[in-house]
Amino acid sequence: MAKESTTIDVGEPSTVTKSSSHVVKDAKKKGFVAVASRGGAKRGLAIFDFLLRLAAIAVTIGAASVMYTAEETLPFFTQFLQFQAGYDDLPAFQYFVIAVAVVASYLVLSLPFSIVSIVRPHAVAPRLILLICDTLVVTLNTSAAAAAASITYLAHNGNQSTNWLPICQQFGDFCQNVSTAVVADSIAILFFIVLIIISAIALKRH
């Protein structure tokens, strides 16, 4: 009796599995590239944030120092009077010095959080803390600049309605110093606005 033989056909290896694995690998690769790209952008923002804080520290310390040393004594005096002008003669200027000194101290304390944002660009907590604190501190800084600016304006122009005479014609150096301090603090306010925008952009990318 002849033995029947059975033949089993083995088809060609399917390419479906291979193509699927390639798709998965490509997707993972693209995802990794996207994450790395976002991380690089956030790190760049964090570095710019750190440098801007250093600049703001220099500006605020300079503004507080110039206002603190603003003082002038006129070369003439009477038997009972000596004509002198100083920052401590006006409460608005005293408030300016104290407030801007607080702002400068905060900026120094905020540097470690900025460094953490550079090392860990995807971390949300330090960036959120900086955003909240920057918003609060810029309010303090703006109030100090506004108070000092109003008194500086009166020193330059006076007020005819209240018979307040301008004093800057006599105390030129004093007015120059306080004006410089107000301008410097206004620049610091602009720095803070940029810092807040940077933090908002970094948080939006999460």
Swiss-Prot record:
Q: Please give the InterPro entries that the UniProt record associates with this protein.
A: CASP/CASPL, CASP_dom, CASPL
Keyword Transmembrane helix included in the entry's annotation:
yes
* Residues annotated as transmembrane: 44-64, 96-116, 128-148, 181-201
**Effect of a null allele:** Disorganised deposition of Casparian strips.
Q: Where is the protein localized?
A: Cell membrane
Modification N-acetylalanine occurs at: A2
Q: What is the effect of changing F174V?
A: Abnormal subcellular localization
Which residue spans belong to the Cytoplasmic compartment? 2-43, 117-127, 202-206
GO BP annotation list = cell wall modification; cell-cell junction assembly
* Entry's Gene Ontology molecular function annotations: protein homodimerization activity
The principal location of this protein is: membrane
Q: Extracellular side: which ranges?
A: 65-95, 149-180
Q: Does the keyword Membrane apply?
A: yes
Q: Which Pfam families match?
A: CASP_dom
Q: Name one GO cellular component term.
A: plasma membrane
Q: Which UniProt keywords apply?
A: Acetylation, Cell membrane, Cell wall biogenesis/degradation, Glycoprotein, Membrane, Transmembrane, Transmembrane helix
Provide the topology term for how it sits in the membrane: Multi-pass membrane protein
The function of this protein is: Regulates membrane-cell wall junctions and localized cell wall deposition. Required for establishment of the Casparian strip membrane domain (CSD) and the subsequent formation of Casparian strips, a cell wall modification of the root endodermis that determines an apoplastic barrier between the intraorganismal apoplasm and the extraorganismal apoplasm and prevents lateral diffusion.
Q: Could you describe the subunit structure of this protein?
A: Homodimer and heterodimers with other CASP proteins. Interacts with CASP2, CASP3, CASP4 and CASP5.
Q: What is this protein called?
A: Casparian strip membrane protein 1
> What is the scientific name of the source organism?
Arabidopsis thaliana (Mouse-ear cress)
| Lineage of the organism | Eukaryota, Viridiplantae, Streptophyta, Embryophyta, Tracheophyta
